């Protein structure tokens, strides 16, 4: 019997785990090991993938993986006895505290003035970034989707200038499966921080502690932060901190990062262990008597063989030994073992497999989880079922239900766009426009009264106020869109969307996880491209990155608003929503084309955690909105301001650098006329339009300011083009190359070759789509 054969609600025990390579290692690291209980929770609305419950959290898996290679199932064992609460109290070990762990005489602190560097490491979605913000005062994006931190961020701990803490992408183990996991592993092993702050979700402690076991093997000063303890206590659970600290040999501090509880104590312990280089008191997780001692003898035999190699490579020997058993090729290459040593190690591992009755990777995973089970049984009093889990289950009945999930997704996205473009965002935009118009009129009157030079007057009013002001008026719409997208992410709904849409996206060659970078792309292409790092497959990453720019970013909203109001005022909201769906449709067609040509093959297995729904914190939402507004304002007063000044200058002066009142005699007209013929078949061969498209490569918002400056006003622009020409131009703006910042992010992720291919491809697609629109409008 395989995992696929389970019925909803049935529980069984894992017999064997199939698969191979990094994928199988990832399954083991996620807790799917022989002897572990697993429960089928439900299937996705389209029947695939499935949702499993293991170690107290939810995991997704596709049916073909379950049927082909996952498990054989045995009879479920009897339930374990409840944790005892009546054990004798354990004296506080005092790890990470002065005068308790070591004597004054035995101290060997780092020199004063040494910068203490910390790696903030933990599983995805455990609250790392929230803790980072509390530690440093930085304003990193806080979300509720696995992989919010897609690059490492650093900052000094408050009131401790000689420190640097780095927020690393979340990982489940030190066996890298995705590019973000590689970032974390390379930092911890390669840059050797003076200390590690390991944050653990106390409500999901078994799965989180798996990474802790591996971090302890690095022999780096370390403190364990038990996050979300307020939730655990609120559900009737608790953790015997003293006992856990004694068993692990590292300081354990209960905290609530969201409420800033226990953070000061955590900082004190972290500074102490780093300053005095107090290393973990325990690294050996398997005793000589555990399962006959097979794994213990294997690891220690390998340690004896590779000790000199590990020291030369700068890799902790215990960590190197366990990774060699798991078959980690990167570690093996770094150790530079000769052939004889490799054969001896292989002989030791094979003997262990025979004695233990498990393959090498499963034996190491079992060793860690066996210790975790012992630790949890002695230190954790679990609640029967948390309020957060019950609430999530009730919400999921509707949002991931068989008949309700797709309508719910469509309805939610439609509501987001309607409120953004038709109600809240529009009302705020109109209000801001009134203020900008009043300020412009007042400045115009002031400059006239002061008899300011005509050129300067034109620069200030026609260039700065008209150009930048027209872009600023769209700030409310952009902020409103980001507000709703952040709500979807913070609550945990984004992860459900990936679960619901996986089967559909597989048909066009993508994974369900690809939906999240593309949804983020509706806000801005740059973070959407960066979010693709959460995808484990290079193929999936490239496809997702190339498709994300087809999701219309918020910077294009000013263009849509201008065109819709000028040419289609009676159907403005419909036109704007239709553009979004057109971008999605073109992206789907491109995905199908790429799947059949450049990126042949299937998407990688869909393995992802489904976090509990959480109410977004008001502070986090306001913080995110401020970041987006600030970013937009910075762009408005830097890139867009500079582009506006340049456009004004090129428009106001001729080739002899003489001020001209005739725009057709300007330098700008001469430059733009060179590419204008390319757009003649599309119905807009006007040099002013060509100029706007060029400036749009710098920043999409510049298209509006450029058109407003060159035509003099929105009304003049509306009079210059017919709807039959405006529609193709609108489609071209939707689909042509993203801004320079987005292109730079693609270059950073995939290299210059793919960035150029993306720009060329989108320009060609945009031209063809605009030409088709022109033909339709001429009917």
Predicted regions and their residues:
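Hydrophobic core segments of alpha-helical transmembrane domains in multi-pass membrane transport
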Residues: 408-419, 481-486, 564-566, 579-593, ...
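Extended helical scaffolds that flank P-loop GTPase cores
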Residues: 249, 276, 283-453, 659, ...
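Conserved G1/Walker A P-loop phosphate-binding module
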Residues: 92-173, 191
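Conserved C-terminal guanine-recognition region of P-loop GTPase G domains, centered on the G4
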Residues: 160, 185-252, 559
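Canonical P-loop GTPase G-domain recognition
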Residues: 232-285
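Extended, low-charge hydrophobic alpha-helical regions
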Residues: 355, 362-366, 382, 423-464, ...
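Transmembrane helix-loop junctions at the membrane interface of multipass transporters and ion channels
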Residues: 550, 554-577, 741-751, 770-779
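Juxtamembrane inter-helical linkers in multi-pass membrane proteins
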Residues: 434, 438-442, 495-525, 600-624, ...
């Amino acid at each position: 019997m395989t995992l696929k054969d389970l019925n909803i609600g049935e529980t069984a025990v894992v017999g064997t785990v199939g698969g191979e390579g990094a994928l199988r290692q990832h399954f083991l690291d996620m807790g799917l090991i022989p002897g572990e209980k697993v429960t089928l929770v439900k299937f996705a609305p389209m029947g695939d993938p499935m949702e499993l419950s293991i170690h107290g959290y939810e995991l997704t898996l596709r049916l073909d993986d379950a049927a082909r290679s996952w498990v054989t199932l045995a009879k479920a064992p009897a339930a374990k006895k409840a944790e005892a609460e009546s054990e004798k109290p354990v004296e506080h070990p005092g790890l990470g505290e002065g005068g308790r762990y070591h004597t004054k005489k035995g101290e060997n602190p780092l020199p004063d003035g040494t910068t203490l560097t910390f790696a903030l490491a933990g599983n995805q979605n455990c609250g790392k970034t929230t803790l980072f913000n509390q530690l440093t005062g930085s304003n990193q994006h806080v979300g509720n989707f696995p992989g919010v931190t897609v690059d490492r961020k650093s900052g000094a701990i408050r009131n401790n200038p000689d420190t640097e803490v780095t927020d690393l992408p979340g990982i489940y183990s030190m066996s890298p499966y995705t590019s973000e996991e590689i970032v974390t592993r390379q930092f911890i092993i390669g840059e050797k921080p003076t200390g590690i702050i390991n944050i653990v979700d106390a409500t999901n402690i078994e799965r989180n502690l798996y990474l802790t076991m591996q971090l302890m093997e690095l022999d780096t000063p370390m403190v364990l932060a038990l996050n979300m303890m307020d939730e655990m206590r609120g559900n009737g659970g608790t953790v015997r901190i003293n006992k856990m600290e004694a068993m692990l040999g590292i300081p354990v501090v209960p905290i609530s990062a969201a409420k800033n509880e226990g953070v000061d104590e955590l900082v004190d312990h972290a500074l102490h262990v780093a300053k005095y280089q107090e290393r973990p008191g325990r690294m050996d997780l398997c005793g000589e008597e555990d399962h006959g001692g097979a794994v213990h003898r294997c690891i220690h035999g390998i340690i004896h063989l590779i000790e000199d190699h590990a020291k030369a490579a700068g890799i902790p020997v215990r960590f190197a030994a366990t990774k060699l058993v798991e078959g980690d090729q990167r570690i093996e290459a770094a150790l530079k073992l000769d052939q004889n040593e490799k054969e001896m190690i292989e002989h030791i591992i094979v003997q262990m497999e025979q004695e233990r009755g498990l393959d090498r990777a499963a034996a190491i995973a079992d060793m860690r989880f066996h210790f975790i089970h012992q630790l949890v049984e002695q230190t954790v009093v679990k609640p029967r079922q948390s309020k957060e889990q019950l609430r999530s289950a009730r919400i999921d009945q509707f949002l991931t239900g068989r008949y309700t999930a797709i309508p719910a997704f469509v309805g939610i996205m439609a509501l987001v766009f309607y409120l953004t473009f038709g109600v809240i965002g529009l009302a705020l935009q109109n209000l801001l426009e009134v203020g900008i118009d009043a300020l412009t009129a007042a400045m115009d009157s002031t400059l006239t009264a002061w008899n300011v030079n005509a050129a300067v007057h034109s620069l200030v009013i026609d260039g700065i106020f008209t150009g930048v002001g027209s872009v600023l008026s769209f700030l409310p719409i952009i902020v409103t869109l980001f507000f709703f997208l952040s709500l979807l992410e913070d609550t945990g709904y984004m992860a459900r969307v990936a679960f619901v849409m996986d089967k559909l996206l597989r048909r066009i060659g993508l994974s369900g996880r690809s939906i999240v970078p593309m949804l983020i792309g509706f806000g801005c292409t740059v973070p959407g491209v960066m979010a693709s790092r959460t995808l484990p497959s290079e193929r999936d990453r490239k496809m997702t990155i190339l498709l994300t720019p087809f999701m219309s970013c918020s910077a294009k909203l000013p263009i849509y608003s201008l065109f819709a109001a000028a040419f289609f005022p009676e159907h403005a909201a419909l036109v704007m929503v239709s553009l979004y769906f057109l971008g999605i449709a073109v992206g789907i067609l491109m995905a199908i084309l790429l799947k059949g040509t450049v990126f042949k093959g299937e998407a990688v297995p869909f393995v992802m955690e489904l976090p509990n729904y959480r109410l977004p914190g008001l502070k986090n939402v306001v913080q995110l909105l401020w970041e987006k507004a600030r970013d937009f304002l910075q762009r408005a007063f830097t890139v867009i301001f500079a582009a506006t000044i340049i456009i004004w200058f090129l428009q106001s002066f001729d080739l002899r650098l003489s001020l001209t009142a005739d725009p057709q005699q300007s330098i700008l007209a001469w430059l733009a006329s060179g590419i204008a013929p390319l757009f003649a078949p599309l119905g807009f061969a006007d040099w002013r339009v060509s100029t706007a498209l060029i400036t749009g490569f710098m920043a999409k918002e510049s298209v509006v300011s450029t058109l407003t400056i060159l035509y003099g006003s929105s009304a003049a622009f509306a009079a210059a083009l017919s709807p039959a020409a405006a529609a193709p131009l609108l489609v071209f703006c939707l689909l042509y190359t993203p801004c320079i910042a987005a292109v730079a992010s693609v270059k950073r992720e995939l290299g210059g070759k793919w960035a150029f291919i993306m720009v060329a491809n989108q320009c060609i697609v945009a031209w063809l789509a605009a030409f088709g629109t022109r033909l339709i409008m001429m009917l």
